[in-house]
Amino acid sequence: VGYFTNPLLNYSDGQQRVDKKPFITRWRLEPKPEDRERYLRGELVEPAKPIVFYIENSTPSRWRKYIKQGIEDWQAAFERAGFKNAIVARELTDSMNVDKDDVNYSVLTYAASTKANAMGPSILDPRSGEILEADIMWWHNVLGMLQEWITVQTGVVRPEARGVRLPDELMGDAMRFVACHEVGHSLGLRHNMIASWTFPTDSLRSKTFTDRMNTTSSSIMDYARFNYVAQPGDGVTALSPHIGPYDMFAIEYGYRWYGKETPEAEKDLLADFLSRHADRLYKYSEAQDVRDAVDPRAQNEDLGDDAVRSSLLGIENLKRIVPQIIQWTTTGEKGQTYEEASRLYYAVINQWNNYLYHVLANIGGIYIENTVVGDGQKTYTFVEKEKQQAALKFLLDEVLTY
Protein backbone atom coordinates (compact mmCIF):
# COMPACT_ATOMS: atom_id res chain seq x y z
CA VAL A 1 0.00 0.00 0.00
CA GLY A 2 1.52 3.32 -1.06
CA TYR A 3 2.07 5.47 2.00
CA PHE A 4 4.93 7.81 2.73
CA THR A 5 6.99 6.45 5.61
CA ASN A 6 9.01 7.96 8.41
CA PRO A 7 11.79 5.71 9.75
CA LEU A 8 12.43 5.31 13.46
CA LEU A 9 16.17 4.69 13.83
CA ASN A 10 17.22 2.22 16.49
CA TYR A 11 20.80 2.22 17.79
CA SER A 12 21.68 -0.60 20.16
CA ASP A 13 24.73 -2.58 21.19
CA GLY A 14 23.26 -5.82 19.84
CA GLN A 15 23.01 -4.62 16.22
CA GLN A 16 25.65 -4.62 13.52
CA ARG A 17 23.95 -1.80 11.67
CA VAL A 18 21.36 0.88 12.35
CA ASP A 19 17.90 -0.67 12.42
CA LYS A 20 15.25 1.31 10.53
CA LYS A 21 11.66 0.76 11.56
CA PRO A 22 9.37 2.57 9.10
CA PHE A 23 6.01 3.99 10.18
CA ILE A 24 3.48 5.19 7.63
CA THR A 25 2.65 8.88 7.84
CA ARG A 26 -0.98 9.53 8.83
CA TRP A 27 -3.19 11.73 10.95
CA ARG A 28 -4.25 10.58 14.40
CA LEU A 29 -7.88 9.64 13.79
CA GLU A 30 -9.49 7.88 16.72
CA PRO A 31 -13.07 7.51 17.91
CA LYS A 32 -14.06 9.41 21.02
CA PRO A 33 -13.78 7.24 24.16
CA GLU A 34 -17.57 7.10 24.50
CA ASP A 35 -17.91 5.96 20.84
CA ARG A 36 -15.29 3.23 20.78
CA GLU A 37 -17.63 0.32 21.37
CA ARG A 38 -20.00 1.59 18.69
CA TYR A 39 -17.08 2.00 16.30
CA LEU A 40 -15.79 -1.53 16.89
CA ARG A 41 -19.33 -2.83 16.25
CA GLY A 42 -19.15 -1.28 12.78
CA GLU A 43 -21.13 1.92 13.34
CA LEU A 44 -19.94 5.14 11.70
CA VAL A 45 -18.73 7.66 14.29
CA GLU A 46 -17.12 11.08 14.16
CA PRO A 47 -13.42 11.16 15.09
CA ALA A 48 -12.30 12.83 18.29
CA LYS A 49 -10.33 15.32 16.20
CA PRO A 50 -11.31 15.64 12.52
CA ILE A 51 -8.93 16.82 9.80
CA VAL A 52 -9.72 20.43 8.90
CA PHE A 53 -8.39 22.29 5.87
CA TYR A 54 -8.87 26.04 5.58
CA ILE A 55 -9.19 27.54 2.10
CA GLU A 56 -7.24 30.79 2.20
CA ASN A 57 -9.23 33.90 1.30
CA SER A 58 -6.90 34.86 -1.56
CA THR A 59 -8.20 31.82 -3.47
CA PRO A 60 -10.29 33.07 -6.44
CA SER A 61 -13.92 32.86 -5.34
CA ARG A 62 -15.09 31.05 -8.50
CA TRP A 63 -12.96 28.00 -7.62
CA ARG A 64 -13.58 27.73 -3.88
CA LYS A 65 -16.62 25.45 -4.00
CA TYR A 66 -14.83 23.04 -6.33
CA ILE A 67 -11.75 22.96 -4.12
CA LYS A 68 -13.97 22.32 -1.10
CA GLN A 69 -15.56 19.41 -2.95
CA GLY A 70 -12.12 18.00 -3.79
CA ILE A 71 -11.07 18.09 -0.15
CA GLU A 72 -14.29 16.57 1.14
CA ASP A 73 -14.38 13.89 -1.56
CA TRP A 74 -12.15 11.96 0.85
CA GLN A 75 -15.05 11.67 3.32
CA ALA A 76 -16.32 8.62 1.44
CA ALA A 77 -12.96 6.89 1.86
CA PHE A 78 -12.86 7.64 5.58
CA GLU A 79 -16.35 6.21 5.95
CA ARG A 80 -14.87 2.93 4.72
CA ALA A 81 -12.49 3.23 7.68
CA GLY A 82 -15.41 3.79 10.06
CA PHE A 83 -15.37 7.59 10.40
CA LYS A 84 -17.94 10.12 9.25
CA ASN A 85 -17.11 13.81 8.76
CA ALA A 86 -13.45 12.89 9.19
CA ILE A 87 -12.20 15.60 6.85
CA VAL A 88 -13.82 18.99 6.30
CA ALA A 89 -12.99 22.16 4.38
CA ARG A 90 -13.72 25.66 5.63
CA GLU A 91 -13.29 28.98 3.90
CA LEU A 92 -10.94 31.24 5.80
CA THR A 93 -12.42 34.66 6.57
CA ASP A 94 -10.98 37.78 8.16
CA SER A 95 -13.28 37.34 11.15
CA MET A 96 -11.73 33.97 12.03
CA ASN A 97 -8.99 33.88 14.61
CA VAL A 98 -6.81 31.73 12.35
CA ASP A 99 -3.25 32.52 11.27
CA LYS A 100 -2.52 30.70 8.03
CA ASP A 101 1.17 30.51 9.01
CA ASP A 102 0.38 28.91 12.37
CA VAL A 103 1.48 25.28 12.47
CA ASN A 104 -1.79 24.40 14.22
CA TYR A 105 -3.81 25.05 11.05
CA SER A 106 -3.77 23.24 7.71
CA VAL A 107 -4.30 25.73 4.90
CA LEU A 108 -4.81 25.54 1.15
CA THR A 109 -3.02 28.54 -0.33
CA TYR A 110 -3.26 30.15 -3.75
CA ALA A 111 -0.25 31.86 -5.36
CA ALA A 112 -0.37 34.24 -8.31
CA SER A 113 2.41 32.60 -10.28
CA THR A 114 3.24 31.36 -13.77
CA LYS A 115 4.17 28.00 -12.26
CA ALA A 116 1.83 25.24 -13.44
CA ASN A 117 1.73 22.93 -10.46
CA ALA A 118 0.39 22.18 -6.98
CA MET A 119 1.80 20.36 -3.96
CA GLY A 120 0.79 19.08 -0.53
CA PRO A 121 3.63 18.95 2.04
CA SER A 122 3.08 18.05 5.70
CA ILE A 123 4.75 18.27 9.12
CA LEU A 124 5.34 15.02 11.00
CA ASP A 125 6.07 13.82 14.49
CA PRO A 126 9.38 11.99 13.82
CA ARG A 127 8.72 9.53 16.63
CA SER A 128 5.60 8.01 15.11
CA GLY A 129 4.95 9.37 11.62
CA GLU A 130 1.85 11.20 12.86
CA ILE A 131 0.90 14.06 10.54
CA LEU A 132 0.53 17.15 12.71
CA GLU A 133 -0.28 19.70 10.01
CA ALA A 134 -0.41 19.86 6.22
CA ASP A 135 -0.54 22.63 3.67
CA ILE A 136 -1.55 22.64 0.04
CA MET A 137 -0.14 25.16 -2.39
CA TRP A 138 -1.50 25.69 -5.87
CA TRP A 139 -0.09 28.11 -8.41
CA HIS A 140 -2.36 30.03 -10.76
CA ASN A 141 -1.02 28.63 -14.00
CA VAL A 142 -2.09 25.11 -13.10
CA LEU A 143 -5.33 26.32 -14.70
CA GLY A 144 -3.55 26.71 -18.04
CA MET A 145 -2.19 23.18 -17.84
CA LEU A 146 -5.64 21.82 -16.98
CA GLN A 147 -7.21 23.69 -19.87
CA GLU A 148 -4.77 22.09 -22.31
CA TRP A 149 -5.36 18.60 -20.91
CA ILE A 150 -9.15 19.00 -21.09
CA THR A 151 -9.10 20.24 -24.69
CA VAL A 152 -6.51 17.84 -26.08
CA GLN A 153 -7.78 14.75 -24.26
CA THR A 154 -11.56 15.28 -24.46
CA GLY A 155 -12.25 18.06 -26.97
CA VAL A 156 -13.41 15.74 -29.73
CA VAL A 157 -16.06 14.07 -27.54
CA ARG A 158 -17.43 17.12 -25.71
CA PRO A 159 -17.90 20.45 -27.52
CA GLU A 160 -17.71 22.47 -24.29
CA ALA A 161 -14.03 21.46 -24.01
CA ARG A 162 -13.13 23.47 -27.11
CA GLY A 163 -12.09 27.09 -27.27
CA VAL A 164 -9.76 29.54 -25.58
CA ARG A 165 -11.88 29.93 -22.45
CA LEU A 166 -13.63 26.88 -21.05
CA PRO A 167 -16.81 26.98 -18.90
CA ASP A 168 -16.27 27.42 -15.17
CA GLU A 169 -18.02 24.12 -14.47
CA LEU A 170 -15.54 22.24 -16.64
CA MET A 171 -12.50 23.98 -15.17
CA GLY A 172 -13.96 23.69 -11.68
CA ASP A 173 -14.28 19.93 -12.04
CA ALA A 174 -10.59 19.84 -12.99
CA MET A 175 -9.65 22.00 -9.98
CA ARG A 176 -11.63 19.59 -7.84
CA PHE A 177 -9.47 16.69 -8.99
CA VAL A 178 -6.24 18.66 -8.41
CA ALA A 179 -7.31 19.53 -4.86
CA CYS A 180 -8.34 15.93 -4.22
CA HIS A 181 -4.99 14.60 -5.47
CA GLU A 182 -2.94 16.99 -3.34
CA VAL A 183 -5.05 16.26 -0.26
CA GLY A 184 -4.26 12.60 -0.87
CA HIS A 185 -0.58 13.41 -0.40
CA SER A 186 -1.47 15.37 2.74
CA LEU A 187 -3.17 12.24 4.09
CA GLY A 188 0.05 10.27 3.59
CA LEU A 189 -0.60 8.67 0.19
CA ARG A 190 2.11 8.34 -2.44
CA HIS A 191 1.60 8.34 -6.19
CA ASN A 192 0.24 5.05 -7.51
CA MET A 193 1.17 4.93 -11.18
CA ILE A 194 -0.05 1.40 -11.85
CA ALA A 195 -3.64 2.33 -10.97
CA SER A 196 -4.56 3.33 -14.53
CA TRP A 197 -3.44 -0.11 -15.78
CA THR A 198 -6.13 -1.76 -13.64
CA PHE A 199 -8.86 -0.45 -15.99
CA PRO A 200 -9.08 -2.35 -19.32
CA THR A 201 -8.54 -0.07 -22.31
CA ASP A 202 -11.76 -1.13 -24.03
CA SER A 203 -13.75 -0.52 -20.83
CA LEU A 204 -12.80 3.16 -21.02
CA ARG A 205 -14.98 3.29 -24.14
CA SER A 206 -17.96 1.78 -22.32
CA LYS A 207 -20.57 4.18 -20.98
CA THR A 208 -21.75 1.53 -18.53
CA PHE A 209 -18.26 0.97 -17.10
CA THR A 210 -17.24 4.64 -16.98
CA ASP A 211 -20.52 5.72 -15.38
CA ARG A 212 -20.13 3.02 -12.73
CA MET A 213 -16.49 3.78 -11.92
CA ASN A 214 -16.79 7.58 -12.46
CA THR A 215 -13.03 7.93 -12.86
CA THR A 216 -10.24 7.16 -15.33
CA SER A 217 -8.12 5.09 -12.93
CA SER A 218 -8.50 3.09 -9.74
CA SER A 219 -6.68 5.88 -7.88
CA ILE A 220 -6.76 9.67 -7.83
CA MET A 221 -3.09 9.37 -6.82
CA ASP A 222 -2.15 8.23 -10.32
CA TYR A 223 -1.14 10.73 -12.98
CA ALA A 224 -4.11 9.58 -15.04
CA ARG A 225 -5.85 12.64 -16.40
CA PHE A 226 -8.90 12.76 -18.66
CA ASN A 227 -10.28 9.96 -20.82
CA TYR A 228 -8.44 10.27 -24.12
CA VAL A 229 -9.39 6.70 -25.10
CA ALA A 230 -13.13 7.39 -25.56
CA GLN A 231 -14.08 8.01 -29.20
CA PRO A 232 -16.85 10.10 -30.74
CA GLY A 233 -19.99 7.98 -30.76
CA ASP A 234 -19.07 5.93 -27.68
CA GLY A 235 -21.43 8.01 -25.55
CA VAL A 236 -18.95 8.27 -22.67
CA THR A 237 -19.57 11.33 -20.48
CA ALA A 238 -17.71 10.43 -17.25
CA LEU A 239 -14.32 11.64 -18.46
CA SER A 240 -12.62 13.06 -15.37
CA PRO A 241 -10.51 11.47 -12.60
CA HIS A 242 -12.03 11.05 -9.14
CA ILE A 243 -11.39 8.92 -6.05
CA GLY A 244 -11.32 5.24 -7.00
CA PRO A 245 -11.34 1.76 -5.43
CA TYR A 246 -7.64 1.83 -4.53
CA ASP A 247 -8.04 5.10 -2.61
CA MET A 248 -10.88 3.64 -0.54
CA PHE A 249 -8.78 0.57 0.17
CA ALA A 250 -5.64 2.56 1.07
CA ILE A 251 -7.45 4.87 3.50
CA GLU A 252 -9.14 1.95 5.22
CA TYR A 253 -5.78 0.18 5.52
CA GLY A 254 -4.05 3.20 7.04
CA TYR A 255 -6.81 4.74 9.13
CA ARG A 256 -9.05 1.99 10.49
CA TRP A 257 -8.74 1.99 14.29
CA TYR A 258 -8.33 -1.42 15.91
CA GLY A 259 -7.86 -0.31 19.51
CA LYS A 260 -4.58 -2.21 19.87
CA GLU A 261 -1.75 -1.06 22.14
CA THR A 262 1.16 -1.69 19.73
CA PRO A 263 1.74 -1.85 15.95
CA GLU A 264 2.76 -5.49 16.34
CA ALA A 265 -0.68 -6.32 17.72
CA GLU A 266 -2.26 -5.08 14.48
CA LYS A 267 -0.05 -7.08 12.10
CA ASP A 268 -2.33 -10.08 11.69
CA LEU A 269 -5.39 -7.86 11.25
CA LEU A 270 -3.66 -5.85 8.52
CA ALA A 271 -2.36 -9.00 6.81
CA ASP A 272 -5.90 -10.38 6.75
CA PHE A 273 -7.17 -7.09 5.32
CA LEU A 274 -4.61 -7.26 2.50
CA SER A 275 -5.44 -10.89 1.75
CA ARG A 276 -9.06 -9.86 1.18
CA HIS A 277 -8.01 -7.20 -1.33
CA ALA A 278 -5.96 -9.19 -3.84
CA ASP A 279 -7.85 -7.88 -6.88
CA ARG A 280 -5.76 -5.89 -9.36
CA LEU A 281 -7.86 -2.80 -8.61
CA TYR A 282 -5.86 -2.51 -5.38
CA LYS A 283 -2.38 -2.84 -6.89
CA TYR A 284 0.30 -0.30 -6.04
CA SER A 285 3.52 0.66 -7.78
CA GLU A 286 5.92 3.50 -7.13
CA ALA A 287 6.39 6.31 -9.61
CA GLN A 288 8.87 5.97 -12.46
CA ASP A 289 10.32 8.56 -14.79
CA VAL A 290 8.33 8.51 -18.02
CA ARG A 291 11.52 8.56 -20.09
CA ASP A 292 13.11 5.46 -18.56
CA ALA A 293 10.23 3.46 -17.06
CA VAL A 294 11.05 -0.19 -16.35
CA ASP A 295 7.54 -1.49 -15.66
CA PRO A 296 5.35 -0.32 -18.57
CA ARG A 297 2.19 -0.72 -16.46
CA ALA A 298 3.24 2.06 -14.07
CA GLN A 299 3.71 5.23 -16.12
CA ASN A 300 2.71 8.88 -16.00
CA GLU A 301 -0.14 10.28 -18.07
CA ASP A 302 -1.32 6.90 -19.41
CA LEU A 303 -4.66 5.09 -19.42
CA GLY A 304 -5.74 1.48 -19.78
CA ASP A 305 -3.99 -1.88 -19.72
CA ASP A 306 -2.94 -1.95 -23.39
CA ALA A 307 -0.51 0.85 -24.21
CA VAL A 308 -0.57 0.21 -27.95
CA ARG A 309 -4.36 0.23 -28.23
CA SER A 310 -4.79 3.18 -25.84
CA SER A 311 -2.20 5.18 -27.76
CA LEU A 312 -3.71 4.35 -31.16
CA LEU A 313 -7.13 5.50 -29.93
CA GLY A 314 -5.57 8.64 -28.49
CA ILE A 315 -3.84 9.37 -31.79
CA GLU A 316 -7.13 8.98 -33.66
CA ASN A 317 -8.55 11.75 -31.50
CA LEU A 318 -5.49 13.95 -32.04
CA LYS A 319 -5.96 13.54 -35.80
CA ARG A 320 -9.49 14.85 -35.36
CA ILE A 321 -8.26 17.90 -33.43
CA VAL A 322 -5.49 19.14 -35.74
CA PRO A 323 -7.74 20.24 -38.65
CA GLN A 324 -9.89 22.20 -36.18
CA ILE A 325 -7.16 24.03 -34.25
CA ILE A 326 -7.75 27.38 -35.98
CA GLN A 327 -11.52 27.09 -35.58
CA TRP A 328 -11.21 26.28 -31.87
CA THR A 329 -8.72 29.04 -31.04
CA THR A 330 -9.70 32.06 -33.14
CA THR A 331 -12.83 34.17 -33.54
CA GLY A 332 -12.15 35.50 -37.03
CA GLU A 333 -11.49 38.97 -35.64
CA LYS A 334 -9.13 40.91 -37.90
CA GLY A 335 -5.64 41.22 -36.48
CA GLN A 336 -6.05 38.35 -34.01
CA THR A 337 -2.84 36.40 -33.52
CA TYR A 338 -2.36 32.65 -33.72
CA GLU A 339 -0.83 32.46 -30.24
CA GLU A 340 -3.61 30.25 -28.87
CA ALA A 341 -3.50 28.06 -31.97
CA SER A 342 0.22 27.60 -31.48
CA ARG A 343 -0.31 26.72 -27.84
CA LEU A 344 -2.91 24.08 -28.68
CA TYR A 345 -0.78 22.61 -31.46
CA TYR A 346 2.15 22.30 -29.06
CA ALA A 347 -0.15 20.56 -26.55
CA VAL A 348 -1.21 18.09 -29.26
CA ILE A 349 2.43 17.29 -30.07
CA ASN A 350 3.23 16.85 -26.37
CA GLN A 351 0.28 14.46 -25.98
CA TRP A 352 1.42 12.46 -29.02
CA ASN A 353 4.90 12.31 -27.52
CA ASN A 354 3.46 10.85 -24.30
CA TYR A 355 1.76 8.09 -26.28
CA LEU A 356 5.07 7.11 -27.87
CA TYR A 357 6.82 6.75 -24.53
CA HIS A 358 3.92 4.74 -23.11
CA VAL A 359 4.47 2.18 -25.87
CA LEU A 360 8.27 2.37 -25.91
CA ALA A 361 8.46 1.23 -22.28
CA ASN A 362 7.11 -2.18 -23.33
CA ILE A 363 10.23 -2.92 -25.38
CA GLY A 364 12.66 -4.54 -22.95
CA GLY A 365 10.20 -3.83 -20.14
CA ILE A 366 9.92 -5.79 -16.92
CA TYR A 367 6.87 -6.24 -14.71
CA ILE A 368 7.82 -5.57 -11.08
CA GLU A 369 5.72 -7.04 -8.27
CA ASN A 370 5.77 -6.12 -4.58
CA THR A 371 6.73 -9.54 -3.23
CA VAL A 372 7.43 -10.97 0.21
CA VAL A 373 8.87 -14.28 1.33
CA GLY A 374 6.41 -17.13 0.93
CA ASP A 375 3.86 -15.46 -1.37
CA GLY A 376 4.90 -17.54 -4.40
CA GLN A 377 5.13 -14.55 -6.74
CA LYS A 378 7.93 -13.63 -9.11
CA THR A 379 9.40 -10.22 -8.42
CA TYR A 380 10.52 -9.65 -12.02
CA THR A 381 8.89 -10.90 -15.23
CA PHE A 382 9.74 -9.81 -18.77
CA VAL A 383 7.00 -8.23 -20.85
CA GLU A 384 5.50 -10.86 -23.16
CA LYS A 385 7.19 -11.27 -26.55
CA GLU A 386 3.95 -10.54 -28.39
CA LYS A 387 3.47 -7.24 -26.56
CA GLN A 388 7.03 -6.18 -27.31
CA GLN A 389 6.55 -7.00 -30.98
CA ALA A 390 3.29 -5.04 -31.08
CA ALA A 391 5.05 -2.09 -29.46
CA LEU A 392 7.83 -2.19 -32.04
CA LYS A 393 5.32 -2.31 -34.89
CA PHE A 394 3.50 0.69 -33.41
CA LEU A 395 6.71 2.72 -33.34
CA LEU A 396 7.60 1.71 -36.90
CA ASP A 397 4.12 2.65 -38.14
CA GLU A 398 3.49 5.81 -36.10
CA VAL A 399 6.92 7.35 -35.60
CA LEU A 400 9.49 6.30 -38.16
CA THR A 401 9.25 7.29 -41.81
CA TYR A 402 10.74 5.35 -44.68
Please identify what each model-predicted range represents:
Residues E72-F83, G184-H185, L189, F226, ...:
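Sec-exported extracytoplasmic/periplasmic mature domains
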Residues M119, L124, E130-W138, R176-L187, ...:
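Extended catalytic-interface subdomain
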Residues S196-Y402:
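Conserved catalytic/binding loops enriched for acidic/polar residues
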Residues S58-A86:
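Zn2+-dependent metallopeptidase catalytic core
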